[in-house]
Each structure stands twice: as structure tokens, then as C-alpha cells.
Amino acid sequence: MYKRVLLKLSGEVLSGEDQKGFNEEHVEYLIKEIKGISEYGTKLGIVIGAGNIFRGRDFEGLRPTISDQIGMLGTVINALYLKDRFENAGIRTVIVSQIVTLPSVKLINYDDIDLYFDAGYVVIFAGGTSNPFFTTDTGAALRAVEMKAELLIKGTKVCGIYDKDPKKYSDAKKYNVITYDEAIEKNLKIMDTEAFSICKRYNMKILVMNFFENGNLLKAIKGENVGTLVVPKV
């Protein structure tokens, strides 16, 4: 059983693929999955992307720094939305960020993070790394290390990591466990380079799994065989 976990989700978890805004069915599913682990006492941090709010690639003419700042603010919007929905469902939630302080958003202080966890809060990390040119994957890797997580879960639409695209190749092989060095050698795109290097440097386990399969989050927390686990060595 993992006691301290960082969950990284894309904004599409809230909206559906290639959609904008919030899809009620998807949000209710997320709430159900989070509630499903609440009785086990796992301290949970969440990093959510902003693809359902804003994608810089959809807008030509924006400077990358401005595009990235809009994306960071998009993660704050998602965090505020989730906090309200979570709390309406009985999930105590706090938002922390390095870029925005609002009545419902606290400035990151890692002494306080431990207090929030001990009090039973889910902690949503908003605003990415607070710097442009870094993805929310990198933000998730940083927050996972900073909150002393035992596992970083990357919730996706696929069942794990494959040797080739399973949508294109029927003989694609799924890895149950793979090392960092193997993943680099095989050029498997698990996270962006910066995020992956942070996890490798600090021996952070990464679990890539299908978030949309009922009960997978609880299975992951329990350490059951789900998705693909990336480890320092086997």
C-alpha cells in the first residue's frame, strides 16, 4: 500500500478528448475514484493539466512565454473547479500554487503541505512549475519529489507503456515493469525529458495506467499489477 502518492492527470480527463470545458460524466468519475481511496489513508497530491481550457498550439502568434502563462492560469481554473466539486462530495481539498494567491489558493509551503495531509486533505498543486517552457509533467515530477511521494501516477487513456503504438500495431507488447535505463534505451516516451530526468535522479517510481478503467486508482494505491511501473532497477 502506497501511503503518499502524486496523481498527474491531463485536462482532457475533465472534458473528454479534443473537447473544452468540463464533462459532467468525466468529473463524476474522477470524484468516485478519489473517494474510493479515501478510507485507506493515502496522502494524495494532484497535478492537473489545462488542455480543456487552453492549448497554446491552437493559437498562432502568441509568444511562448505568454502561451505558457495562460496555460498555468488554466491549471488554476481547473484546480478551483475541482476543489469545489470535491468538497461538495465530502472530499476535503486545498489548492497550493507558486503563481497565484486567491482566497481559495494558498502559497506553497512544504511545512504546511504535511499539515494538510495529516488533516486528511487532498492537495491540488496548481500553476505548474510557475515558469514558462516547462510542462505539467515536469511540474508533477517536481511536486512528487517535494511532497516526498512514494509513487507518481500518470493517468492516461492507455493501459500502460508499449514497445510500439498499440493503436497501430496489433502485436504491440505491453511492459509490466521497466527500468529507467531500459525506457531511455528504447526511446519510450513516458514523460517529457525534464520530468523523466527528475524522477530518475530521485528514484521516483512512475506508474503509467489507464485512469478510465474503474477501480484502477485504488489498485495502483494498493500496489496491484496495473499499468506499467517504471523503476530505478529490477
Swiss-Prot record:
Cellular component terms per the entry's GO annotation: cytoplasm
Control of this protein's activity: Inhibited by UTP.
Residues the record lists as binding UMP: 68, 129-136
Keyword Cytoplasm: yes
Top-level EC class: transferase
Pfam family, one: AA_kinase
GO molecular function annotations of the record: ATP binding; UMP kinase activity
Residues that bind ATP: 8-11, 51, 55, 156, 162, 165
Key words of the record: ATP-binding, Cytoplasm, Kinase, Nucleotide-binding, Pyrimidine biosynthesis, Transferase
Catalysed reactions, as listed in the record: UMP + ATP = UDP + ADP
UniProt main location, coarse: cytoplasm
PANTHER family: URIDYLATE KINASE, URIDYLATE KINASE PUMPKIN, CHLOROPLASTIC
Family: Belongs to the UMP kinase family.
Name assigned to this protein: Uridylate kinase
Organism phylogeny: Bacteria, Thermotogati, Thermotogota, Thermotogae, Thermotogales
